Amino acid sequence: MSFAPLTNDTFLRACRRQATDYTPLWLMRQAGRYLPEYKATRARAGSFMGLATNVDYATEVTLQPLERFPLDAAILFSDILTVPDAMGLGLSFAEGEGPRFAKVVRDEAAVAELAVPDMDKLRYVFDAVTSIRRALDGRVPLIGFSGSPWTLACYMVEGKGSDDYRLVKSLMYARPDLMHRILAINADSVAAYLNAQIDAGAQAVMVFDSWGGVLADGAFQEFSLAYTKRVLAGLNRTGADGQDVPRIVFTKGGGIWLPDMKDLDCEVLGLDWTANLARARAIVGGEVGGPGKALQGNIDPNVLFAPPERVAEQARAVLDSFGAPHTDRTTTGPTHIFNLGHGISQFTPPEHVAALVETVHSHSRALRQR
């Protein structure tokens, strides 16, 4: 499969811990409801799933934030719950309620019915990946993604989002054998799903462990991290264009487990806003010329509700907290990809995002001149 050559590879260079002219930036949920143009496209599509399952609409909304802001990567417009939907759990999005499943997985009989889905049921996702990659025309790289095995299990057991994760944790503690069976199937499903995205043209892939942070120490390592490792072990390392495909792992609330994640078989670790970038760099960032992880994050998304000058101030603080940028182009070293600590709020003023992007690019260039 051939695609246009990349004109801005800053994000991929940072993923590989290579020196860059500035700190690259993209935003979790950058294609979304804070953009009026997204709302207009969604209205035409009629529903969220109408948007996500239509290749033309998915391509259009993926590119919308790039038309507005000089971001350094695009991320596939989709949802983490497409995989359990393909398992036959019946995903729907009620207006104002978020996702829910018609079927839940809470007992032996339901677990026995689970299997890695036929990836052809997710063909709309892979067709969208190829369509977006072609539409980008080499402007910036395209990131594919999936939920983590644990995060998918949370929704599959609860049937929807949860405040206390009572049902999934009850199953985990009462019947760990069942939970391990769910997670093993999820891990193999996620690996197959991400590999199909890579084959379709994704240039990096990200595992969102959005609910890993709700677990107790010990439980996180057993029920979340172990299965993220299983996903990573099953991933293709080479993309459709013959280039290596960096892998990003983001665990919301996972900063306390950085020592456990130090040896994950991935290139980038995402951090939420509770983590200290300098401390994270010291634990996993590595030294110049040695092994390590690139770091991604981690400004509090709610900073974007402050006036633009405050947004700029906080963005500079995040860049400064990472420390001196790696500038030696002859070797690898600690690198930073700027992002939010979680997805952008639908109520965010777009002009505040513009202030963030401009500040990150200008201040990170200035840091490299010092």
Swiss-Prot record:
Which residue spans traverse the membrane? none
Pathway(s) it belongs to: Porphyrin-containing compound metabolism; protoporphyrin-IX biosynthesis; coproporphyrinogen-III from 5-aminolevulinate: step 4/4
Pfam families per record: URO-D (PF01208)
* Cited SUPFAM superfamilies: UROD/MetE-like (SSF51726)
Fetch the InterPro entries from UniProt. UROD/MetE-like_sf, Uroporphyrinogen_deCO2ase_HemE, Uroporphyrinogen_deCOase
Q: Which reactions appear under catalytic activity for this entry?
A: uroporphyrinogen III + 4 H(+) = coproporphyrinogen III + 4 CO2
Q: Keyword Phosphoprotein on this protein? A: no
Instruction: Spell out the subunit comment.
Output: Homodimer.
Q: What is this protein called?
A: Uroporphyrinogen decarboxylase
Name of encoding gene: hemE
